[in-house]
Structures are given as structure tokens and as C-alpha cells.
């Protein structure tokens, strides 16, 4: 069954741990059915770093909320989702809620070129993402300047490939 994700940066704001964040609505589909519905919470600091403050997620049809977390609750900490000035070798937590969400990234390259859906992107940031909670999974993610995420490739623990298909304005 074909799968796809839809991600929308909303106009909604929320305050978490004293910081005003932006709500990003992320839905995952199998065919035409929503299988995961998530609100992700992000904020950008004065230096340009983008922080991840948590997520409120629900899997359907089970209605499981496993993986939901919020910075400042149960000792969870916000993590970096994107560094303003990344350097090869930088390592950082993207999210840290012990035994719930412990994703980490390592910067592998700042000058990749990738072609996705017939569009070539240059000076692409390449990260390697891992988690202590899923030690058998390693994913490479590619971020293009002025665009953001364009490609994800599972390099250990699966063969998934996620590509940016289109960018558009969301209706939320």
C-alpha cells in the first residue's frame, strides 16, 4: 500500500517551558487512511538554531500515544532539530525524553548533492540519525538550503526511502 506524509507549519503558537513555539502538524498516511497524527513543537533561537520541544502523537486506529513527550515534563529536554552553524562531526540530541524519545544526529557532510524527483540540490547537509531506543536503525537525512528536508534513506535496519515530492502552502 502506498504511503505518504503531509507536514504543515501552522499559525498556531504555544508556550512550552517558557518558550513560544510554533505548532507543525504532521500526518502519516497508508493509502488514504491516516495512521499517525502528530503536533510537533519547534522554536528558533536568536542564533538561528531550531529547537524541538516535543510532540503530541496518536497512532491510528490503535489510538496509542506512545512517543509523545514535552520538554520540561518528566525531565524531558528540548533538542536541536537543526543547528544554525553545523560542522562535520557535530553530534546532538534532537529529542530527549528518557526511554520515550532519544533521537540523536551527527553531521556527516555539508556539501552533498542529491537529486530528488528530478530536482538537483547542492550544498546539502547530511546527517546520520540514531536512537539508543532503536539501536538497529540508522537513517541518513539530507537537508537542502532554503528548502529543508529533501531525502531520507534507511542505511541500517530497513530499506525505506523518503523523498520530498512537493511543497505547497497548507490550509490550516
Residue ranges, per PLM feature:
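Conserved functional acidic sites
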Residues: 1-172
Amino acid at each position: 500500500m502506498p504511503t505518504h506524509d503531509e507536514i504543515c507549519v501552522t499559525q498556531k503558537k504555544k508556550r512550552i517551558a517558557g518558550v513560544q513555539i510554533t505548532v507543525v502538524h504532521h500526518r502519516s498516511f497508508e493509502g488514504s487512511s491516516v495512521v499517525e497524527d502528530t503536533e510537533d513543537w519547534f522554536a528558533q533561537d536568536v542564533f538561528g538554531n531550531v529547537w524541538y520541544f516535543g510532540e503530541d502523537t496518536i497512532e491510528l486506529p490503535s489510538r496509542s500515544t506512545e512517543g509523545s513527550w514535552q520538554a520540561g515534563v518528566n525531565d524531558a529536554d528540548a533538542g536541536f532539530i537543526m543547528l544554525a552553524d553545523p560542522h562535520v562531526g557535530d553530534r546532538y540530541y534532537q529529542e530527549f525524553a528518557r526511554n520515550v524519545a532519544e533521537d540523536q544526529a551527527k553531521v556527516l557532510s555539508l556539501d552533498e548533492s542529491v537529486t530528488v524527483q528530478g530536482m538537483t540540490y547542492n550544498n546539502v547537509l547530511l546527517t546520520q540519525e540514531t536512537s539508543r531506543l532503536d539501536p538497529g536503525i540508522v537513517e541518513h537525512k539530507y537537508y537542502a538550503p532554503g528548502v529543508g528536508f529533501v531525502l531520507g534513506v534507511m542505511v541500517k535496519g530497513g530499506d525505506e526511502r523518503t523523498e520530498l515530492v512537493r511543497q505547497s502552502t497548507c490550509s490550516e
